[in-house]
Every structure is written in C-alpha cells, then in structure tokens.
Amino acid sequence: MHARQRNVGNGYRSGSIGMGMSGSRISPERPMRGHGFYGSEHQHRGFNRGYGRGRGRSKSYHNQLPPPLPPPPVQRRSSGGDVFMEAGRLATEYLVSQGVLPQTVLSSKWQNGNFRKQAGEFQSSRSQEEARMDVSAPAAEKRRYIDGYSSAGSRNSLKGRRSHRYDSDFGRSGSWSERSKAFETETGDDSVSGHQEEQPLAEDIASSVQRSASGEFMRKCEGAGDSESVLDKYNLQDEAQSKTGSSSAGKDIVQDCEISKVSEGSSSLSAGSGEMKGRSGGNGGEDENQTAIEDGSIHQRCEDASIDQQCGADESFTKSGIDLATLCKFEKVPTRTRSSLTAKGPKLYLSHNIKDTSHNSGLEEEDQTENRCETRGQSSGKADSTGDENDQVEDFALVQYIENSKCHRSNSFPSSILRDNSEKESGLELPNLHRSHSVGKVGEKRPGEGSDLEEGSKRQRDWVAVSEANERFNMFKTSGNQCDPEEEGKTSSFNKRLIDGAAGKRVSHESLVNNSTYNRTHTGRTGPGYAEEHQLFPASFKMCDLNLGGASDVNDGIKESRQAVDFDLSISSSSKSLEFGTSTRMSNGKEIEVINLDDDQEVVKSSNDPGRKQEAAPYMGIDDVPDYNERLMMVEYLDSFTPINQGTSSVPQNNNTVSLQDREGAIGNDQVPNNTDDDSIFMSLGEIPLTFLQAWDQPPARGYEKPF
C-alpha cells in the first residue's frame, strides 16, 4: 500500500504513468483496502518496477527503503502567496460581516489556526475526502499529486487525528523536541509512512507550529464550505511557515515561552491555563456557523494580546502590596480553623494575625479565585462539547478575569506555596498550642490537688525518709517493751489504717520495718517486742519466722485472715526497702525473707532439735524452704553418686593386679552400673538412655545391608 507513494526507478510517480485518478487518490483509510484496490496497486507495482519488488515484498521492507528526493519547492512557493491571500480574504469577510473588529487588528495566526483545524476536521472521514476530490480542479490535483500523494488528504487527516490525540495532552506545556518525537512515533502508521519519508522535517516543524498556534480551539471548528480554498492554504502553509518564518508562528512561540518563563515553578498551572484558554475558545467554535468561529477568534486574540499586560499588572499589584481582598467581592470567609482560633485563643492568635494579615488576605483572594477557576475549568473540561457562542459572549469578562488570576497564581506560585505552608502549619500548630496550654493548666492543677500523693511517692524513692522514720518512731521502740497485748492490737490497727490510707502507705511500712529490726536486735526472740513484730507484719513473714521463735502460732492464724488485704502492698513496698536489699533470696514477692544470714546460722545450730523439725515440717510445701533442708537434699543427691566414685577409685587398683582381659572386664563391669545410673538421670530429665541408644543402633545397620 505504500508503494503508491514512492519513487520508481525512473524518478516518476506511479499514478502519473497510467493509473487513474479515482483509483490512486483513494484515501489511505483501512476500510478501502478490500474494494479492488490491492489489485490495482499490485498491477502498478509490477508495471513500474519490473526488477522484482512487487509481489513478494512486505510493508516493512518498503518502510526500510531510502527516502526519495524531495519535490522541487518552486511550485509550492509560486502558489504559497495565493493561499495566504485567500485565507486573509476569508478572514476579512468574517470580520466585516460581524463588524466587531477592523481588518487590520486581527492577526493572521488565528485565521490560519481556525482554517487548519477546519480542514483537519473536514478530512477526518472518507466521504468528505471524496467530496473534496470532486470539487478539486484537475490542475491542482496534478500539481498536488506530483508534489506528494494526497498531500492535502493524508496530511490533513493525519493532523486532524493528531490534534485530537496530542493537543489535550500537551496543551501549552512540553518542549518542541518532545512534540516532534511524539509526531515521529505517530508516523509509524500505514497511512502516514509514505508522506513522512517525503518531507519529515518540514512536517515536524509545521505540525509543532500548528499545534502551538491553534491550541485547543482547533478541536471544535467544523466547516463544510470553502473546502478547496481551505485545503490549498493548508497544504502549502506548512513549508511556507517552516522556511519563511511567518510572524504568526513566531509570535505564538514567543508568547508560549513567556508563559513558561512566568510559571517556572508551576508548569501544571500554566498547562491548565493553556488548556482553559483553548477550551474557552473551543466552546464557542463547536457550531458550524461563522459567528461561532468569529467569537472563538476574538477570545483567542484578546487573551493572547492582553496576557502580557495582565501579568505585568499582577506583578505590580503583588510588588506594591495592594490588598487584593478589597478588589474581590466573594461571600466566602476564611476557613473554620482561622475563625475558631480567633474565637478560642485570641491572645495566641493576635500576634500571628498581625504578622500574617497581608498573607491571609492574599491567600483568601487566591484560594477563592482558584476555586472559581477550578469550577470553570471543570465545567469547560467535562462539558467541552456542549458550550455555545452565547456562553462565550456572556462569560468573556469572566474568562479575562480567570486568565488574570491564573497568571497571578503562576507568577506568585513559589511565594504562595510558602505562605500556604506557613498558614497550614500555623493552623495546625495553634490549636495544638491552645490545647497543650490548657493541658498544661490542668497539669498545674493536678500537683495542687494530689501533692500529698506525689510527695509520698517521692519520699519512698528518696531514702532520706528512712532516717526520719527511725527518729519518728522511737516511741514504738520504747513502748514495745512496756505495752500490753491490747495496746499492741491498737497499734496494729492504727498501722493498718495507715496502710489503707493513700498518703501513708510508704511511711507506715518503713516504720514497721525499722521497728521490727530494732525488736530483733535488742529485745531477743521471745518477748513482747517479738510478739509485736508478729502482729505488725503480715502472715507471709511469720511463716519464715517460725524457724526462729515459734511463740505465737495461734495469733498468727487469727491475724492472717484480717491482714490478708494488705499482703500485696506490704510485699511490693518491702521489696524496695534498704534492709531487704541486702537479702540474696528475693526471687519474687512470695519468697521475701526477713531472716538475715546470721539468723540462718543460728537455725543451723538449733537444727538438731527434732521438735523444731516437726514444727517446720508443715511448711515444707511452700516455696520458702529453710537452708538446712536444702543442704540435706544436696547430701542425699551426692550420696546417690557413690558407685561412680567407688568405680573410679577401684579402676587403678585393678590395673596393678588384674590382666588385660580382667581389666577390660572390670571396666565393663564398671560401665554397667554407670549406665544404669545415667539411665536414671536421663529418664528423670526426659531424655533417652544411652543403653537404649546402643541397642537401637545395631539392628537397623543389619537391615540396611540387605538391599545393598
């Protein structure tokens, strides 16, 4: 299919030798392949290329052929002026018919852009192309056919499709190299490859200029009349603009660059602005009427003509410090965070509000205009094909104001980002500061309310209070020798009340510890002080003290049910005392012992008494087992290994008197009880005995020898 568009060996086109115009000028659309077209194409290949490139070659091979010589540009230059004159004449007629602007004001680039898109939309279907072929003059067809196959048809249909694909993606953002690369990827299609090989460079430049000049407005222009003049202009305008450098393309490039420079840090905003401009112009160009085209051209001209002035005015407003909030009349108020902060914490927000008054006003204006612009952009983006000319005429002032705000937004974008961040941080931090301030006040009130609790807890950590407790409770030391059992019960109930109280938990226990220590050291084991010790301390301590005194067992059983409530408190507090810090037998709260090492020695001395052992026997089941019992258990455990010691001692004796066989037998006899002892140990530990392993290893070895 591509051979129609290539030079043959003698330098002529295939269509000019003998192919009919109706057969060779069929549009390169895919649905036309099956209508007898492939046969005629193959016939031309075989006729013109007799050296064997016709039948067996694929399209990929034809794409790899070297590009043909470019056509002589003299023919295009001779008629290029006529096309521009015709385009200017049509544009002038439109303007005069409307009477909006004079002939000299309207720039030629919008005329060219409108007619380009009009031609692209006109060539998007096969029926329109066939109608164009019927209207075309034979001389024009001859010239266009020699210059390139369907230079108006394939080229315009290509640009019509490409404008739909890439204009919305690029907008006014993206470099020229990216656009040209995207166009080169587009030219891989079957309907484009031949023409792209003829003029790749001119097509790339012209397509990029055409895309930047026309923008989004070309998407909606559809014109059915004046097709031949439009196509003549559009066919010859690409190379004319690429070689002569027309003022329209140059101005558009300059303005496009200015927009990109103004929006350095906000390419997305500038792209959105470009798309909005294209859409605002394209909404009025949907109808096929001339008035719609005129309105679109007016919008485009006015926006591009005044964009630099608007940017300059915005810069002057920004630099001069004029409050833009006074110029806008919106009903919106600042966000809820700002208003709530002014109501809740006026003192905290006052200084910050004085500093950021200008920032707040600028941000309010920017946020409100951004909301309006986003609303307008969404309406024009979603309903891109539903706008009419009346909306454009009514909203022309709004479009200008939107462009003004967009330019201001993109110009002051970096500073506005900083201000937005500062406002967001202030809006997020100020409520937190207010809350933390209130929490601080609550925290200040709490020490006033519960100061006694904190002082009591701090005294427990600061061990200076122990000496104070010793001095404070000297009365208990002296009264312990003189008080009656009734007074002892009163003191115990008093201490119990102190333990139950929130403020006196630690102090009362320290007093008890010191008092009991004094009673043990001074009054002996059997006396009123010792009885007081048993009454003051809980039952868990008395179980340990039975080994020493064993005097008041009945009182212990009576007091155990009463003071069981304070067991955990006394244990947790006593574990932190200095006296118990020297004890080496504190594994957990239940195993705390009041007995010192010196007391244990006395227990060992008195352990020969059988009656004492019987008294200690009922308490063997509890974790706190006396040391002498543990020693006896260790001795019995060591006595169980006596055969091992005897065996090791008997081995060297047998070495001197017994022969090797007897010695081996003796060793074997020694191993037998050793194995039995090891078996008993391993079975107690839950492991497998060694003798069982020895018997286990032998039978499987015999069994494994059989298959191998």
UniProtKB/Swiss-Prot annotation:
Residues 442-461 have a biased composition (Basic and acidic residues). Residues 260-274 have a biased composition (Low complexity). Residues 65-74 have a biased composition (Pro residues). Disulfide bonds: none annotated. Residues 238-249, 410-419 have a biased composition (Polar residues). Residues 1-79, 119-301, 349-390, 410-461 are annotated as: Disordered. This is Uncharacterized protein At4g26450. It comes from Arabidopsis thaliana. The lineage of its organism: Eukaryota, Viridiplantae, Streptophyta, Embryophyta, Tracheophyta.
